[in-house]
Amino acid sequence: MPIQVLPPQLANQIAAGEVVERPASVVKELVENSLDAGATRVDIDIERGGAKLIRIRDNGCGIKKEELALALARHATSKIASLDDLEAIISLGFRGEALASISSVSRLTLTSRTAEQAEAWQAYAEGRDMDVTVKPAAHPVGTTLEVLDLFYNTPARRKFMRTEKTEFNHIDEIIRRIALARFDVTLNLSHNGKLVRQYRAVAKDGQKERRLGAICGTPFLEQALAIEWQHGDLTLRGWVADPNHTTTALTEIQYCYVNGRMMRDRLINHAIRQACEDKLGADQQPAFVLYLEIDPHQVDVNVHPAKHEVRFHQSRLVHDFIYQGVLSVLQQQTETTLPLEEIAPAPRHVPENRIAAGRNHFAVPAEPTTAREPATPRYSGGASGGNGGRQTAGGWPHAQPGYQKQQGEVYRALLQTPTTSPAPEAVAPALDGHSQSFGRVLTIVCGDCALLEHAGTIQLLSLPVAERWLRQAQLTPGQSPVCAQPLLIPLRLKVSADEKAALQKAQSLLGELGIEFQSDAQHVTIRAVPLPLRQQNLQILIPELIGYLAQQTTFATVNIAQWIARNVQSEHPQWSMAQAISLLADVERLCPQLVKAPPGGLLQPVDLHSAMNALKHE
C-alpha cells in the first residue's frame, strides 16, 4: 500500500481515540472550553449516559462568526500562538483538536454569539472532508455545544461503552472534580431531563467548605485539616483528612489540582502518602483535596493525551514542599474540649439507606469535642534552617536582651491563674448581684469571642459557649412544651429494634422538646422539630440523636436538650458586633442565671491593672 495522506475525517477519528475515550471525556473537554471562555455558569444536559445527547451551554465570551469554521478544524485554537505560550500554559485547553475529534465521531452542532454580534450563528461539520456549514441561529451571549449519537460511525468504539448508569457516573465524577477546581462557577448537571447536581458559585471560605461537604461528604469535612503553605513561587492550599480517623470510604477522596488543572500525578500522591505513612495502616490511603500553584514555566502539562499528568522541572523541590506542608498540618492539629458536661457521643456508624435518605451536605454538623484550625506555615520564604522557620531574636535589627527579674515577676503575676477552693463546677467570677447585663460589647476577638466592659472591668466572653447555653434554654420546656414546627417534607429513616425501642420510650419527652415522629415496623418518620433545629442538617442530626438515645438507660428532657445544644451547627462561623449584641440580649432574657453566676468556660476576666503595671516597669 503506497504512502498517502489520510482523509480529514479518518485522521480526526484516529485522534479521537486518544481524546474521546468515553462520554465523560467529551464532557471534560467541552466544560473546560467553557471555563477558558470565562463562563460563570455551565449547564450540562445528558441523555442515556451521554450516548444519545451531550449538551453543554455556557455564558462565556462566545465565538465570532468568522471563527466558527476554524473552531471545528484540527489544530486551531485561541489559547496559544507560539512556543513561549506553550511553555507557560495557563488555560485548560491548548491543542485545538478536541472539537475536531469529537465532531468526527458524533453529530456535533456548535451555536455561539459574542456580545458584539447582533445575532448568533450555528456551525456543524459533515461529510468525508468535514466541511463546515454556518447558518444564523437564536442564542444568548455564550456558546452551546450539542453532541448527538456519540460513536455512531465507529461501531467498535460504541460496543465498548458501558451501561447508561456507569457512563453517567463517570460524567458525574468529572463534574465533581471541576466543581472542586472552580468554586466561582455555577455548574448544573441534568440526566434524562432531571436535575441531578447543582453547584452554585461561592466566594467565601465558609461557603467553599459547604461545597466541599456536598461533593466529598460530611465525614470528610468533619476530619478535614486545612492547609495553607507557601515557599517561593510554590503555594499549597486545600484539605487533608486526619489519618487517625481515615476510613475506607474516605480513601476514595483523592483530588489534586495543579494551577487549577485536575491531576493524577504519582509524585504528588507519593509526597502525601509519605507525610501520612506513620499514621496510616498498610492498606489505607490518605484522603485529600489539594491545590498546588506553581510558576507555569516550571511545569510541563503537554505530556499526556488527556492532560492527566504533568512533569515538574524541579520535581524533588515540589515533592519535598508538598511533603513538608502536609506533615506540618498533621503535626500542628490540636484538640480542645467543650466546657459543657461530658456526654457520650452518638455512634458514628450510619446505615447506607439512612445516608441515602435525602442527604444534604450544605448543612454540616458541628463536631462537639474537636476544633481544628489551619496550620500556620513554618516553611516560608527561603528559610531552611533547623528552627523550622521561627524568627530568632538575632534576626531583628533592634533586638533587646531578655526581661529583668523584676519584670519577670510582674509578668508571672499577670499570667498566673488565681487559686480557688475546689468546687464541683468551675464558675467564673459573678457580676454584681443586682445586674442583669453582661455589659457593653467593645469588639470581637478572633472571630468567636466578645470583649465586654462592665462596671469598670473587662471580660472576655466565648460566643459559641453562650450560643450553646441559649440553644439549651430554647429547647428546654418550661410550663408548656416547646412549640413544634412541622416539616414540609417529613424525614423517613430506617431504625434498628433497639433504636425503635429507645424512641418509643422517650417519645413523650421528645414531644415536650418539639420533636414529633411516627414509627412503623422498621422506620421512623420525623414530622416536626423545634424552631432552633429548622436550619440544621436533620439527615445527620436526627440519626445521631437516635443513636444517643439508644445508648441511654434513663431519659430526662434536660439531658436530651443539652445533647442537642452541643451537637447543633452554629449559624455564625465568624461573629460580627451586631450578632454578638443580639446573642447576649437573648441570653440575658432567657438565661438570667448565667449573668449572675457565669459557668466555667463562658467568661474570663482580663486584668488590665496588672498589664498596665507591667508596662510601667522598665
Curated annotation (Swiss-Prot):
HAMAP family: DNA_mis_repair (MF_00149). Keywords: DNA damage, DNA repair. This protein is involved in the repair of mismatches in DNA. It is required for dam-dependent methyl-directed DNA mismatch repair. May act as a 'molecular matchmaker', a protein that promotes the formation of a stable complex between two or more DNA-binding proteins in an ATP-dependent manner without itself being part of a final effector complex. This is DNA mismatch repair protein MutL. GO terms for molecular function: ATP binding; ATP hydrolysis activity; ATP-dependent DNA damage sensor activity; mismatched DNA binding. InterPro entries: DNA_mismatch_repair_CS, DNA_mismatch_repair_MutL, DNA_mismatch_S5_2-like, HATPase_C_sf, MutL/Mlh/PMS, MutL/Mlh/Pms-like, MutL_C, MutL_C_dimsub. It comes from Salmonella paratyphi A (strain AKU_12601). GO terms for cellular component: mismatch repair complex. The keyword DNA repair applies. Signal peptide: none annotated. Belongs to the DNA mismatch repair MutL/HexB family. Residues 382-392 have a biased composition (Gly residues). Residues 367-402 are annotated as: Disordered. One of its GO terms (biological process) is mismatch repair.
